Curated annotation (Swiss-Prot):
This is Uncharacterized protein S183L. It comes from African swine fever virus (isolate Warthog/Namibia/Wart80/1980). Induction: Expressed in the late phase of the viral replicative cycle. Belongs to the asfivirus S183L family. The lineage of its organism: Viruses, Varidnaviria, Bamfordvirae, Nucleocytoviricota, Pokkesviricetes. Keywords: Late protein.
């Protein structure tokens, strides 16, 4: 799985990066999927690797097509483009779901929605963290202890972000399949 945040691709492994480039090249060769630069920097692109045309994840999302279209969620081949969502967007989505299903644990729903709610501060934070890590890539021999601690804190923060991104597809799949069972 690979995620594009703020126009920068973060791959969880080399195979995912290779697979995405290969599939993107195939789609571009038949003019089916636009070049990456056509994707807005504010968007988050989640690629679903190994999915088939009848992938339950995509089919479940398409069941909510009208609402998702209003939220500017875009399907491009096997790519799902999720624009940045604000607090009002999340509130509207929760309200939309409440009107269609009976949930006993709306707090859990809100928590899951937060996982797909990224804002500009997240993008800024993740990029600044990478920049600071690169700045310390070849530290001098006299590097101070507090700087080393800072590096470890940044690495821990980045690992937390990667875990959140890695769980995104799983959480969304579980959440949407759960919704469909309630309809």
């Amino acid at each position: 799985m690979s995620v594009v945040v703020g126009g920068v691709e973060y791959s969880l492994n080399n195979w995912a990066r290779y697979e995405i480039k290969r599939r993107a090249a195939e789609l571009e060769s038949v003019n089916y999927y636009p070049h990456c630069e056509y994707v807005m920097p504010e968007d988050i692109v989640v690629s679903i690797l190994g999915s088939k045309p009848n992938c339950p994840f995509l089919e479940a999302l398409k069941r909510f097509h009208d609402f998702l279209k209003k939220r500017r969620v875009i399907f491009k081949g096997e790519y799902l483009v999720i624009p940045w969502m604000g607090a009002q967007d999340v509130a509207d989505m929760i309200h939309h779901v409440e009107n269609r299903i009976n949930l006993d644990h709306l707090e859990d729903l809100a928590h899951m929605l937060k996982l797909i709610t990224y804002h500009r501060s997240f993008d800024t934070c993740i990029n600044q963290s990478f920049e600071q890590l690169y700045a310390f890539k070849f530290p001098d021999a006299n590097i101070e202890t507090h700087e080393l601690k800072h590096i470890r804190q940044l690495e821990k923060k980045m690992y937390g972000y990667i875990l959140r991104l890695e769980k995104l597809q799983t959480v969304l799949t579980f959440y949407i399949e759960f919704l469909l069972k309630q309809v």
